[in-house]
Structures are given as C-alpha cells and as structure tokens.
C-alpha cells in the first residue's frame, strides 16, 4: 500500500477554481488555478455557469496532482472550501442545472427581500438564522429560480430537483450523484437554516415556498461524506472529508478555534470573523451570527462583519482613477507623504456593509484643500480599509464583550506593510500576519485531514502556524481617536446619498 502523504484542498472561489496539495507539515507542494466566466445578464445581476464551475474545479484537481507528480493513491483526503451563498438547482436524474448559479453578489432578489421586511420577518430571521434580510443569502435566490423556471416547484416537490450551495454541487458531481450533503457553515448562510436547532427552518421554507425534498443533508465540517475516484494516476477512491465556507475555512486555517479569537481576510471586500465558542451571540450592532468550526470541526458560533470594498478600492485607484499602475504601487505612493493632509476617502461604491448596512450610501472624498495631491488620496484610500475594519471590530467587541488581543490577517492586501501598520495603529491592537497566506485552503485541508486521522488534533498544527510578522500600534490613543472621529464624520456624510428627496 502506498503511503498517504498528502491532502488536497479544493478552493472554489468567485472568480476562479483552485486546487492545493499539502504535505503533513502543511507545506504547499503545488497549486493549480483556472478562472471562469462572470455572467452579468442585467445591471446588478451576477451568474456563473455551474458546469463551468465543475469543469474548472475538476481539471485543477487533475492538474495539481500531475504538476507535483503525485498519484491519487498518495492522497489521504480531499477538503472543499467555497464561495458561500451562491445557489445552484439541478435535475437529480441528469445532473443538469435548470438555471445558472445565482452568485452571492447578485442583487436581483431585492424585491423579495422588501416583501420579507414588509411582512415583519426581520426579527424572526435574525433570531433564528443569525442573518439580516438581504439578497446576499441563498434563500431568496432559490425562491427566485423556483418562481421563474416553469414547473420547477412541482418538480422539486416530487423530488426531481436538488438545491445546493457550491460545496454540495461539487460533492454531488465528484460522487456521481451518490452524495447530497452540505456542512453547517454553508447551511448557516442560506437564510433557510435554524442555527440553534441545527436543522432546516420550517417557517422559512414555508415563507419562501421551498420544498424540503430538494435540500441537502447537513453534516459536520470534518467527517467522511463520500469517496471520489477523479483525477490523477491510479484512480484510487479518495475520501472527501472536510467542507467549510471560505470565511469559516480561513478562520479554521488561522486556528481561531477558541472563543474570542478573530481573523480579518482582506480580499475584494473584508471579512472579519470572531469565534464566540458554543454560544450564538445575537448582534445588536449590525453583524451576522454564523456557524464556525470548533477544534474538531464541531459546531461553534462566530460573529461576522463584511466590508464590501477593500482590495476593490485599490483596483479603483488603478483602473478608474489611473493614479497607480499596479496595486502594489499603492504602498510606495502612500508612504511618499507623512499623512493624508486631512483627507478621508469613503469607498461606499455599492453602499456600506457592516455595521451600517446602508445600500443608499455612495463613495466620497472629504477634506479636500488646495495642498492635497494624488499621494494623499492613495494613502486615504488605503487607510479607509483599516477604518472600516475598526468599525466592524468595535461592533464585535460591543456584541461579545470580548476585548481582542491580536488580529490575525490574511488575503491579498496583507502584503501591504503600510496598510498592516496603519491597521495596528488605528485598532490599538497587535496585527499578526502568518507565514502561509493560503489560509482558506489550509482550513479545508485541516478539516479533511483531521477527519481521516492524517493529523490527530489541532495541537499538531499549532507549531505550523508561524507568524511571519507582527505589527504593533505606533501612535498615541488621543491621536488614534482623533483620526477615527474624522472617519466617523466622513461616513455619516456619505450615507443616504441615493435616497431621493420627496
């Protein structure tokens, strides 16, 4: 028997599908990535082709093994992490989708959400699903497809159609339709799942008229769900044994498995999650209550805050404003000036996320005087990412009563030392940047490996979580509070911009 030396993580993201091979020391052996098409049928609508998601993801699995010259019988297990909330409906018999995947960013169900609000469901939804009413989550997307594809609701009732988030779709394809499952973290993003009873919520299914027959079975984030024999030489059957939504996988990959530990992922947007242990903390400050993974993949809870514009605002400097040629240049120009010269940039291009949830806010630059140049605006744009992170952290500390000792960070923008130092300055808290930046894939790999005994427990992994650099606050409290007060003033003035005067 060949020694099982590796774990594969499949990381199905919003713009690309990736596969990562790791060894027992959590070193990355090889990576394969394929992008796929973003479909925008109307303004504010976003779709993916589920068959293309599957094609790109399955080919990266074959590629990543070939690249490292590894045969499939050396793989101990496969873990899956995925873009959350994105919704797919398909035929049980043929495996064919009945509609494109409706992506988490898609706003087409805003009207359904308005109806839910008018029907007075906000409190029920917040208390039972942990979420706010927003087109972001899967529930209204499922309803939209059932409303718009003729005969689909009846077919679903007869058990002919299946619903899944991306993890469910991939596993169904990888097991040739034998396994229809999701995990607690992904289920907690559907607005159809009761995070206290850990079961699908009958009232939500009734309100949205979604037949229970089409829903996947919900399982722990770390257990064997089924086997696949796709990819690589040898065609051995490999257990699929870990699933978590991307942000929860990153939280686990950063080993934030104890109450009060938090991470912030700086991608297109920012996602901050704080583990709250075995208690679901109901937010009074505009955050989401969601399910995370405990030390063995069991159910823990987390508070989550989403900032819509982080890396995206640096892309705006590059693509629309033409102030920089490359995202990496932003650090160089930001450090050419001592401060922002009184300027604040509020990047509310698509409204504001947590903790404001104002879809009518718009982007603005405040505090312009004659001495302001391009470098000040670049610096202020970077600083806005750190200010928004503080907004979310303040809400988290208020909700949980926990004072954060250190923030673990990951994602593309953490390579920017200026941003990380300013983040520490404005939070008044240590910021820890890990050696391995692929924490989302790491989380999926850890969950899969723990389930099959590849790793015995998380203690084995603690020593692998090397912090590459720690940033410590370098400004006084009065200065910190003065700057943050300016930010709050700027945000207030950017809010409700789009609301039309009667």
From Swiss-Prot:
Glycerol binds at residues 84-85, 136, 246-247. One of its GO terms (cellular component) is cytosol. ATP binds at residues 14-16, 268, 311, 315, 412. It is an enzyme of class 2 (transferase). The keyword DNA damage does not apply. Belongs to the FGGY kinase family. PANTHER family: GLYCEROL KINASE (PTHR10196:SF69), SUGAR KINASE (PTHR10196). This is Glycerol kinase. It comes from Escherichia coli O8 (strain IAI1). The gene is glpK.
């Amino acid at each position: 028997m060949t020694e099982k030396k590796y774990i594969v993580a499949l990381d199905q993201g919003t713009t690309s599908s990736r596969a990562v091979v790791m060894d027992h020391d959590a070193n990355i052996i090889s990576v394969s990535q394929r992008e796929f098409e973003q479909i925008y049928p109307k303004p504010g609508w976003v779709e993916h082709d589920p068959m293309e998601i599957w094609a790109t993801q399955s080919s990266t699995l074959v590629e990543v093994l070939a690249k490292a010259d590894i045969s499939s019988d050396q793989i101990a297990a496969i873990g899956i992490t995925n873009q959350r909330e994105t919704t797919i409906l398909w035929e049980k018999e043929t495996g064919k989708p009945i509609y494109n995947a409706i992506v988490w960013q898609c706003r087409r169900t805003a009207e359904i959400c308005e109806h839910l609000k008018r029907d007075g469901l906000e409190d029920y939804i917040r208390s039972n699903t942990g979420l706010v009413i927003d087109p972001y989550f899967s529930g209204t997307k499922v309803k939209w497809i059932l409303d718009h594809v003729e005969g689909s609701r009846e077919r679903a009732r007869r058990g002919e159609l299946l619903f899944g988030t991306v993890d469910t779709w991939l596993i169904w394809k990888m097991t040739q339709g034998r396994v229809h499952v999701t995990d607690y973290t992904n289920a907690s993003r559907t607005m159809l799942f009761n995070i206290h009873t850990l079961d699908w919520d009958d009232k939500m299914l009734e309100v949205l008229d979604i037949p229970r027959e089409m829903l996947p079975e919900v399982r722990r984030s770390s257990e064997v769900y089924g086997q696949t024999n796709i990819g690589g030489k040898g065609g051995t059957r490999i257990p699929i044994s870990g699933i978590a939504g991307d942000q929860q996988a990153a939280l686990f990959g950063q080993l934030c498995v104890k109450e009060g530990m938090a991470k912030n992922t700086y991608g297109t947007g920012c996602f901050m999650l704080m583990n709250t242990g075995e208690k679901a903390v109901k937010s009074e400050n505009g955050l989401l209550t969601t399910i995370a993974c405990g030390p063995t993949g069991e159910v823990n809870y987390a508070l989550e805050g989403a900032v819509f514009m982080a890396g995206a605002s640096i892309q705006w400097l590059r693509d629309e404003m033409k102030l920089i040629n490359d995202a990496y240049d932003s650090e160089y120009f930001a450090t050419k000036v001592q401060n922002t010269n009184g300027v604040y940039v509020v990047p509310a291009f698509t409204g504001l996320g947590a903790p404001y949830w104002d879809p009518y806010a718009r982007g603005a630059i405040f505090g312009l005087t004659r001495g302001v140049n391009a470098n000040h605006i670049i610096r202020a744009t970077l600083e806005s990412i750190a200010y928004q992170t503080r907004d979310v952290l303040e809400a988290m500390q208020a909700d949980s009563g926990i004072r954060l000792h250190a923030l673990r960070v990951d994602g593309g923008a953490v390579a920017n030392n200026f941003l990380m130092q300013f983040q520490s300055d404005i939070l008044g808290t240590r910021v820890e940047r890990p050696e391995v930046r692929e924490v989302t894939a790491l989380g999926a790999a850890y969950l899969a490996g723990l389930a099959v005994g590849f790793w015995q427990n998380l203690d084995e992994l603690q020593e692998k979580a090397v912090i590459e650099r720690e940033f410590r606050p370098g400004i006084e409290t009065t200065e910190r509070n003065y700057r943050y007060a300016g930010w709050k003033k700027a945000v207030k003035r950017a809010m409700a911009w789009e609301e039309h005067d009667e």
